[in-house]
């Protein structure tokens, strides 16, 4: 069993999603958004750090998965996103959580099957995979999708490692 915290970073809205993985079964534990209503960036970063720390304390995750920074058209926005992402990662590492990073395209490919999927498609698939009564908010859905991606990728890595080990031992032909 593992609890995974997914984070969709943003300087104004940071989505989070928490799921539990038992074998191949995924279950929803919680999700939401950290909203920073103050104007100055240092105060927003402080709120993101405090919010992520509080979520970690509440859910006690085993793994922390976060979206990688993509290059936006606006360099200033990309820098702010990188800073928001950085404080979230610091909150995780301060709690000794292992951090895993996934590209947005990889998350969409894993959850929807199309790397260029729309936000509404991600929301629908997250709702379906986690058996939720309604679509989660867009930022929370993205965070849940990041957590789901971590589960799928870590399972695949474990299976490949086991197969390689069995091949090395001569158990598979």
Curated annotation (Swiss-Prot):
Enzyme superclass (EC): hydrolase
Primary location group: cytoplasm
Entry's EC annotation: 3.1.21.10
Binding site for Mg(2+) 1: 8, 139
Keywords assigned: Cytoplasm, DNA damage, DNA recombination, DNA repair, DNA-binding, Endonuclease, Hydrolase, Magnesium, Metal-binding, Nuclease
Protein localization: Cytoplasm
Official protein name in the record: Crossover junction endodeoxyribonuclease RuvC
Lineage per the UniProt record: Bacteria, Pseudomonadati, Pseudomonadota, Gammaproteobacteria, Enterobacterales
Gene (UniProt): ruvC
């Amino acid at each position: 069993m593992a609890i995974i915290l997914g984070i969709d970073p943003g300087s104004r809205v940071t989505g989070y999603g928490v799921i539990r993985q038992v074998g191949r079964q995924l279950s929803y534990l919680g999700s939401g958004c950290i909203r920073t209503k103050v104007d100055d960036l240092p105060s927003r970063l402080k709120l993101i750090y405090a919010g992520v720390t509080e979520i970690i304390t509440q859910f006690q995750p085993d793994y922390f998965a976060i979206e990688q920074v993509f290059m936006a058209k606006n360099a200033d926005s990309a820098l702010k996103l990188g800073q928001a992402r950085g404080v979230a990662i610091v909150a995780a590492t301060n709690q000794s959580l292992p951090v895993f990073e996934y590209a947005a395209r990889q998350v969409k490919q894993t959850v929807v099957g199309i790397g260029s999927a729309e936000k509404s498609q991600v929301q629908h698939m997250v709702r379906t995979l986690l058996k939720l009564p309604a679509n989660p908010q867009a930022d929370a859905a993205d965070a849940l999708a990041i957590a789901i991606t971590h589960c799928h990728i870590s399972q695949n890595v474990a299976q490949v490692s086991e197969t390689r080990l069995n091949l090395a031992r001569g158990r598979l032909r």
